[in-house]
Amino acid sequence: MGKVVGIDLGTTNSVIAVMEGGKPTVIPNAEGFRTTASVVAYTKSGDKLVGQIARQAVINPENTFYSVKRFIGRKQNEISQEIRQTSYNVKTSGSSIKIECPALNKDFAPEEISAQVLRKLVEDASTYLGETVTQAVITVPAYFNDSQRQATKDAGKIAGLDVLRIINEPTAASLSYGLDKQNNETILVFDLGGGTFDVSILEVGDGVFEVLSTSGDTHLGGDDFDQQIVEWLIKDFKQSEGIDLGKDRQALQRLTEASEKAKIELSNLTQTEINLPFITATQDGPKHLEKTVTRAKFEELCSRLIDKCSIPVNNALKDAKLEASSIDEVVLVGGSTRIPAIQQMVKRLIGKDPNQSVNPDEVVAIGAAVQAGVLAGEVKDILLLDVTPLSLGVETLGGVMTKIIPRNTTIPTKKSEVFSTAVDNQPNVEIQVLQGERELTKDNKSLGTFRLDGIMPAPRGVPQIEVTFDIDANGILSVKAKEKATGKEQSITISGASTLPKDDVERMVKEAEENFDVDQKRRKNIDIRNQAESLCYQSEKQVKEFEDKIDEELKNRITNLISELRSNLEKEELDSIEANSEKLQNALMEIGKNATSAEKDTQNASNDDTVIDTDFSEAK
């Protein structure tokens, strides 16, 4: 078995880790960073960019895709809040969500965009490890429903990965935190990421990680905190200038990026400045936006969101049947937990300072790597007992949801209930599988519907139909219905809960495989161009630095090569870019030789002037 990696596929950033020498290690990406921006962009010429280099939403808002995790596994009626926060177009295609890419004149499923991020992580990890990575453990928010979990697996499959396990993010964080803990502790994991929020309570110690309860909100995250600043800035600018910046995509994206930056700075500073010159223009000329944001103002703007974060904490404590005083440690996960008001709120609720021993950006991926190590046989004596976050059941007479597996049931699990017919001589039953906590069918999420035919004619209430729910270790559900008298059976694996039909997933996998060489070539071409641009800059810098130490012929040759290379870059002449880059690198090496030679000549001349004739006697 090759290396199995652990991946935290985040809303804002993603991280990949692996077990090395018995210890979980974060793998840096090709650019040398330990986190990779969960952003994919397509340039006007159709080139694909992934990661930090793709953060170009200000100049290319409609083709830059970020926070896509907020759409994965969802339907149109579930994303009204999230759509307002993007600069790209999101639309419905049948029951699925599609993301428009004008640069390619193509629509993408959210799973395809997430697959691009996964592929970038895995390719960089393969280079780092010196072997091809094909297997992974991927984390999801604990409060992800069945559709979102299946969609995450689909994204992994499209990226060419065998996803061995889907694991909850707070549970992964607990694995990282409690790996070396011998004594039993009750910990609360508070996970506030870019787009989702989870709280899990676990018993940790001596290799056993048991989830007692989990709660959360998949519509709450750092993006929403940014949005509060954005809306405040738009309102203020409209009042002072009479212009609605919310209708200008480019301005809106600049506001979003500036708001995120301000939020981050306010974790360490009590106030910061937002300066956006030329944010818009009128017939009177350009308009600039300048605004001071204090931490107090930020907390006032976000007070509703901060209060909202307390609800899942209280729910998790209630479900675990624990008082706040029973919690030994609070582990903070996700970049948004750096917000001082969040830390203060947690301290107020639990009565103790949060544990600061783990890196909130990396702890989930490290835990996923531990679970990957368990599955690969590298890590022994670890027992992970996770739970299902939401209740599962079926629709019964009157549009009522009858729960079969209550929320916070330890998984994997299997439970059965016997139902009957509602009318005399009913030949079949339609079984609607539901997920949620409400009493009525219409208020819960429908995961899928299937029909059991061939029921023997009988008065209502006589036939016995056994419905069995089976949840695997990934938290993914399959349901079976069996008529006891005839033995007739029908089943459904709730992969239909994914917004992508199986045929679409297979097509996307095939497309990804077919385009692998093209993608690699495009990426190589982008790298060549980036290196050439950097080389031009470095060359100009060195010519200026060593101007008095190199001869005129070399200086002119380098200047001409820089001009040629810049011309090649403008015309996208890749062969010439490579050839002239090599010539320019060789010329730069000559600068080094010339400079060293000139320095030696200077030193020799200096030494000749200061030589003193003398004899040294041998030491006795």
From Swiss-Prot:
GO terms for molecular function: ATP binding; ATP-dependent protein folding chaperone; unfolded protein binding. Residues 610-620 have a biased composition (Acidic residues). It is found in: Plastid, Chloroplast. GO terms for cellular component: chloroplast. Pfam families: HSP70. Keywords: ATP-binding, Chaperone, Chloroplast, Nucleotide-binding, Plastid, Stress response. Residues 592-620 are annotated as: Disordered. InterPro entries: ATPase_NBD, Chaperone_DnaK, Heat_shock_70_CS, HSP70_C_sf, HSP70_peptide-bd_sf, Hsp_70_fam. Belongs to the heat shock protein 70 family. Acts as a chaperone. This is Chaperone protein dnaK.
